[in-house]
Structure formats: C-alpha cells, structure tokens
Design a protein with these regions (language model features):
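Extracytosolic ligand-binding ectodomains
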Residues: 4, 8-10, 22-394
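N-terminal signal peptide c-region/cleavage motif recognized by signal peptidases
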Residues: 17-19
Length: 394
C-alpha cells in the first residue's frame, strides 16, 4: 500500500503547487441490494453483515489521505436494502444531492437503479457479473468495476489452454444464472480453441444442501452422475447458484481437475493475495474490520478508489466530467494486481487481471503469457470492442 499512497501524495502536491487547494466535498452513496438467497454450502463462506461496506470504509481512508492535501473531503453514505425498496433508497440519496453511486447487487437491480438515477448521475457496478450489462443492456451512466462472466470464463480458458487441457466436460446448473455462466464458457472455448466434449445439467431439486447432501450421499451420487463421460482433460463447473459445484472435486467418476465455480476459481481478489503490495492492504483491512477481505469488499473499495483518483486528477465531483476522465486515456489506477487498471471506452468495463484461486493460494493470474492483443493483453478477457453491441458508449 505504501507505494500507491506515495504516488497519490505526489499527485496531490503537484496539484497544490499548480494553483492551491479548493474545498470540495465528494459525496458517494453505496447501495447494497440484498436478495433472499440460500446459505452457502460451506459455513466458512457465510456473508458478513458489512459485506462490501467494509471495503468502502478502507477506501474512505485511502481517499482521505490525498483529499486532505487538496481540500477534498469524502462522505460515503451506505444503505442495505431489499429489491423492493432499492429505488426508494436511491431517491432519498438523490434528494440529498448525491450524484455518485456504487451499487452492489444483481444485474436487474443495477439496471433499475441506473435507469432511475438518469443521466445526471454516475453509477459504478461493484457486484453484477452479467455480461449483458456490458453488451446490449449497457447504460451510459453505468461503469463496471466487477468483472463480467465473460472475463471470468476467459481467465479460466487461458489457463486451461496454457496447460493444454483442451477437452472440457461442462457441468451446469438448472437456474438461469447457471445457464448464463455456461454460455460464457462455451464462448470462451470457441475463442481460445478448446472443445466441449460433453455437457450435463445438474438439476436443483431443493432440500438442504448442508444436511440432505452430506458427504456420504455426495460420495455416492456424484460419481454416478458423472459416469460415462467422454474423454476429457478438465471439468468446468457452471454453478452461479452454489448448488453443486463444491461437491465435484475428488468425487468425479474420472479423476480430473475442476475449474470454474469450484476447484480453481477465477476471482477479482481474495484474502491470500500478498503480491504487488497486497499484504499491506490485507493487514489494513483486517485491522479495520476484524475479518478477511471478500471479493465484494475489494470491488467496493476499488470503485470508491476509482472515484477518488478521478476527483484528485480533475478537481471536480461532477459526474459527467468524472466519467469522461475515467474513460479517457489518462486514467489509470494501482489496484494491487501487478499492473494499472483502466476502463474500456466501448462499454465501461474496467480492465483488470483476474486471479485463479484454489481456496488457499494464487495458482495463476490471467491474462496468461502469450495471449496477445493489439491494445492490451487485458483485453483478451471479456467482450472486445467488435463483440460488444453496447450502443450507449458510441
């Protein structure tokens, strides 16, 4: 963390020397839309009450470090609401004069809030992964800090191809979110030259996944479910609903690595990351919150840091000016990922490396060596400009 802070201080001093500090209050609303959902299969993954908001607290500290030199103050207001009151929470914040927002929720929730806020506001999506939000369902006032399903699938695909695991067995769930994830892996296979030799669907029949599907039953059921698959190098689990994927490793009929929603998982960040200065980030987060960081915490932190960096460079809190700067060639931000992150100007998605995590350590980081792109290797992950049908950014 020390080096990024030093760079921020240098930027702050440069602005001060250019013309002195002017008072500016930057007010941001962080809205988390909480939908009813099943408890995670593992109690180790239960959601903390301050999920996302904890990352916002750390970002406020970081932004204040630079802001105090520039006369900038940051005020963050948070709201955790169910879907049916999310727009009311947004309306209240808009009525208080807020025009900058970070949203943690599913795709439909994010789109509803973006449409409600209108052109005079700027929203940063810190949670929704649906690729369609970066495609036909994009919005001009909505930028994406959370990686898309397409980016996550491409991160897995690059590593699989690098390992020469080109024959995939795809197991997907029966929910719409699972089908969307499966489609992202089909797309990735087609782009990177893998072959899906067989697909199977794991039907969600309900019941308690913790008790009704104990290890004795799992040990019997999963091998039977996966028996007779065509020869494959790798199992891809498309289980956005967290119904079955954690049970696949070590239980398949054929002993094969599992990637995707279980086994080796693509993530934006995790608590074991130590490289690129992340150790200090982890220690500061844990000292502040008393727990380990989750992806949602990191993504809210990153969204608020994106806003803070743009405010520092432009000396304004105007949504239109901040958006223009973020999408421009001068914007870049250190994000504890080994290289600066920037935005794609064709759909508002943040370019970023993605970590491949086995539950304990970073196994690898995508984009992988040798996967090239005319603009940036980071653009090998997710929708490229010719693929995107986003019209709002043209």
């Amino acid at each position: 963390m020390r080096r990024p802070i030093c760079l921020l201080l240098a930027a702050a001093l440069a602005v001060l020397s250019a013309g002195g500090a002017a008072a500016l209050e930057v007010r941001v609303g962080v809205i988390r839309v909480d939908r009813p959902q099943l408890a995670p299969i593992s109690r180790l993954e239960e959601w903390p009450r301050d999920l996302g908001f904890a990352g916002g607290r750390l970002a406020d500290e970081d932004n204040a470090t630079t802001g105090r030199f520039l006369g900038h103050t940051y005020v963050t207001e948070t709201a955790a609401v169910p879907p049916d009151t999310a727009e009311a929470a947004l309306d209240r914040m808009l009525g208080e004069g807020l025009r900058l927002f970070v949203v943690l929720g599913q795709g439909d929730d994010v789109l509803a809030l973006a449409d409600r806020a209108g052109d005079g506001a700027l929203l940063l999506n810190a949670g929704a992964r649906e690729t369609r939000l970066r495609d036909a369902d994009c919005r001009a006032n909505l930028l994406h800090v959370a990686p898309s399903e397409a980016m996550l699938a491409d991160a897995v695909a690059e590593f699989a191809i690098w390992k020469k695991w080109t024959r995939w067995a795809l197991i997907s769930g029966s929910h719409p979110e699972d089908r969307a994830m499966a489609e992202a892996y089909r797309r990735a296979a087609a782009i990177f030259g893998a072959k899906i030799v067989e697909e199977r669907v794991f039907e969600d029949t309900g019941g308690s996944r913790r008790t009704d599907t104990g290890h004795v039953l799992v040990q019997r059921q999963i091998p039977v479910f996966s028996e007779g698959m065509k020869d494959h190098d790798l199992v891809i689990a498309a289980d956005a609903s967290d119904v079955f994927a954690p049970y696949l490793p070590f239980h398949m009929w054929d002993p094969r690595p599992v990637m995707g929603a279980a086994g080796l998982r693509p993530v934006s960040f995790h608590a074991a990351t130590e490289a690129w200065g992340a150790t200090q980030f982890q220690r500061r987060f844990e000292a502040l919150t008393g727990r380990q960081v989750r992806e949602e915490d990191y993504q809210v932190w990153l969204a608020l840091r994106v806003l803070g960096e743009a405010v520092t460079r432009t000396d304004t809190a105007d949504p239109a000016e901040l958006r223009a700067y973020m999408l421009g060639p001068e914007f870049e931000l250190a994000a504890f990922k080994g290289q600066k992150v920037t935005f794609r100007d064709w759909n508002g998605q943040l370019r970023q490396p993605l970590l491949l995590y086995d539950g304990r350590i970073n196994v690898s980081v995508s984009p992988q060596d040798g996967f090239l792109h005319q603009r940036s290797p980071l653009d090998t992950l997710g929708l490229d400009a010719p693929e995107s049908s986003c019209a709002a950014f043209r």
